[in-house]
């Protein structure tokens, strides 16, 4: 069945019972095209943004993750899930520091977590052909490799893939600083701006001190 559940959690892990931390829980059902577009539109509203002052003196806004990467995770799960497995759905789980997409079925063909960047196989070729006609996939087998490259270019950890007997888990993560905290672009730029301000203040203070000492020496 074509159904996707998107869950947004408050924090970095899923909790249950009295500590349950689910803040959004939406289920999307429908034809493949509408389902895919609806899921992508909703997930985009849940991706955090960071606004900071760039080196050119202009404010910039970056998303937590490159848009292509989380889009690729969602689209691939819909295109390649094992639709013969009943009783469970695709689940997109969004946490403060990572996104995990769970897709029913093991990796198809000869695709394995260790060769997923190079190996390509369509479990559902008719669905893939249909999605390609609407430019949701290209079927060149380069999407996962591009995702790895875009995460690296953004300074983020490499995507992670693992599987068990009937489920594939794909995860993208935020970078963390030395203290284990999620480091946003604002943190990096804060350091840069701090260094720049320190240099500027140092120059200004140096000039003022020089002028003051010069005046004192002249008076004496």
Model-derived features: where do they sit?
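C-terminal regulatory or interaction extensions
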Residues: 1-220
């Amino acid at each position: 069945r074509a159904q996707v559940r998107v869950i947004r959690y408050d924090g970095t892990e899923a909790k249950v019972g009295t500590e349950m931390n689910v803040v959004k829980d939406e289920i999307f059902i429908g034809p493949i095209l509408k389902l895919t577009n609806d899921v992508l539109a909703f997930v985009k509203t849940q991706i955090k943004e960071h606004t900071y002052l760039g080196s050119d003196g202009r404010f910039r806004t970056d998303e937590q993750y490159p848009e292509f990467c989380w889009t690729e995770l969602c689209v691939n799960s819909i295109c390649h899930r094992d639709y013969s497995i009943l009783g469970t759905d695709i689940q997109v789980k969004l946490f403060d520091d990572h996104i995990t997409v769970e897709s029913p079925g093991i990796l198809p063909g000869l695709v394995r977590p260790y060769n997923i960047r190079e190996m390509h196989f369509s479990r559902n070729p008719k669905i893939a052909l249909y999605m390609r006609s609407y430019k949701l996939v290209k079927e060149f087998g380069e999407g996962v490799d591009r995702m790895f490259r875009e995460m690296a270019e953004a300074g983020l950890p490499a995507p992670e893939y693992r599987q068990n007997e009937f489920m594939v888990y794909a995860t993208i993560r935020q970078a963390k600083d030395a203290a284990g905290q999620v480091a946003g672009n604002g943190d990096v730029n804060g350091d840069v701006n701090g260094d720049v301000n320190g240099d500027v203040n140092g120059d200004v203070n140096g000039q003022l001190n020089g002028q003051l000492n010069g005046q004192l020496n002249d008076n004496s």
